[in-house]
Design a protein with these regions (language model features):
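Short hydrophobic targeting helices and cationic amphipathic motifs
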Residues: 4-5, 9-10, 14-17
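Non-catalytic alpha-helical scaffolds and adjoining flexible linkers that form interface surfaces
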Residues: 21-46, 51-267
Length: 267
């Protein structure tokens, strides 16, 4: 017995096939990102915060592996790790997606093993977790952070690195003052987010000397930032001031817990 299938059958079949593939592709998405922080949810799961190239800041639920093979996978969840992963959309009533198939797309060579670099990474992961919390897709910002973390891994002179990254993130977020408008003797008014000629009447400002150093550093890049002369004390004060600046301009930005550790390193 011979069956003849009509052209309409094939049209309907291939339409169904395309729709099925499209639905599956929506269920699981491949993406690249930078791991910011991990919070233990319970014995089986953790909440993983990633700043991704396509989605911006996203929180995922991640099921922890319990065998020896999976332990290596869990070890990927380190601050600033540049990852590639698959994710599934959030279930109804939840805004947390499911994370799967995570891998390290560019393994670090020095950051996990150098105590100073590791401390910087821990601080910056906490800083970025709060600074980027409401940030959607922002490819220029993603590329900046991605390039900066790669640079740190191979760098030898990086004492101003954490300050410069905080400045660059602020530029992308539109809150950092324009250093080209700085003039000798100006103050940085942190409330207004601009350099001003007169000392502000409130206390949220940076003095003339450090305003000059901040403007100088803001005009540099990775390969020239070490040309900005900063003493250990100035570096510590600027770190505190930049944290205060973010607390003023980013809603719910807290006093960072890891700032004390970083201060000790650069004293």
């Amino acid at each position: 017995m011979t069956f003849f299938l009509s052209a309409n059958f094939f049209t309907s079949f291939f339409s169904y096939l395309r729709l099925t593939i499209k639905k599956k592709s929506k269920m699981w998405q491949k993406e690249v990102g930078i791991l910011l922080s991990v919070t233990k949810h319970n014995d089986k799961t953790s909440i993983v915060n990633i700043f991704s190239r396509e989605q911006g800041y996203t929180s995922f639920i991640y099921y922890l592996a319990r065998n020896s093979k999976g332990a290596a996978k869990n070890a990927l969840l380190q601050p600033l790790t540049r990852v590639e992963y698959e994710s599934k959309g959030a279930r109804q009533g939840s805004n947390i997606q499911h994370l799967s198939q995570i891998r390290n797309r560019a393994p670090f060579k020095t950051i996990p093993f150098d105590p100073v670099k590791r401390s910087i990474a821990m601080y910056l992961s906490e800083f970025l977790t709060y600074a980027l919390k409401n940030e959607e897709m922002n490819m220029p910002l993603f590329n900046t952070i991605d390039n900066y973390t790669e640079w740190l891994d191979s760098a030898e002179n990086y004492s101003n690195f954490h300050l410069l990254l905080m400045i660059e993130v602020g530029k992308h977020l539109g809150i950092m003052p324009d250093s080209s408008l700085y003039k000798s003797g100006y103050f940085l008014d942190m409330k207004e987010g601009e350099y001003v000629e007169r000392e502000p009447e409130h206390t949220d400002f940076i003095n003339q000397q450090l305003s000059y150093k901040l403007a100088l550093l803001s005009a540099t890049h990775l390969n020239t930032m070490q040309n900005t002369p900063l003493t250990h004390q100035e570096r510590v004060i600027l770190l505190r001031m930049l944290n205060n600046f973010y607390r003023i301009h980013i809603p719910l930005f807290p006093v960072l817990k890891s700032i004390d550790i970083l201060e000790e390193i650069f004293r």
